[in-house]
Amino acid sequence: MAYDHTQSVKEVLRHVLFRCGLSETLDVVRHWRGHYTKHTRERDMTGIFSQIYANGAWVMRENQDSLSGVGSTQVATRELSTQLSDFLREVGCRRLVDIGCGDFNWMRSVEGDFDYVGIDVVPKVIEENAAHHGNGRRRFLCADATRQLSVTGDVALCREVLFHLSFKDGLSLLRNVRSASFRYVLFTTDNAVWFNSDIRSGDFRRINLRRSPYGLPAPLRELADDKVSKGRVLGVWPGTALPG
């Protein structure tokens, strides 16, 4: 996969603005473009992401079928759902823990004989998921996995979550997932960028998990997840590959 040098340079500039305390400059630009940015003023994870959902900050298209963003729509995830179903069957997954499950829109299409635990930091999202999708083998928990991860299983899925977290919060999440002793962990990574920028949690940028400060080894395999952004994949690592 060739690097996207233009995007990577943008990430360098984003990082410089963040380090200089000028991230609000980007908020002004986004506001001019019609994007909701008030969630960046919140100081805790629940407040940040509750504001995002309440105000449709991740709804970018008319008739979008997911509040969790364009990447969680059925159109964007049709092939990924099939790949993930095949992988879970192959490794004999008995419990899947979905960290940052969002509104459960695309995961409804993933098939397999496993128990499912969806975790998200937004209480209302979890309440609605439990009411509409919960059953004996599918449950939803409201928790902040950057602070503590109290459940474990065979496989942990954490799709596009790190893209929205600061270095500090992202690395804390990785350590908590490592401590939970999953056999396999799946994280979104973007092979097209060669520089990772730091951000305020709740913002967004593309990251390459093989680059600093994450420094993960090459994944065991990659599930194509590039319908929204070329170069994006869902990487599969052994749980022991994460920083402790």
Q: What role is predicted for each listed range?
A:
Residues 161:
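Hydrophobic adenine-recognition pocket in adenosine-nucleotide-binding enzymes
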Residues 157:
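A conserved beta-strand element that flanks and buttresses the S-adenosyl-L-methionine
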Residues 3-153, 165-244:
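Class I (Rossmann-like) S-adenosyl-L-methionine-dependent methyltransferase catalytic domain
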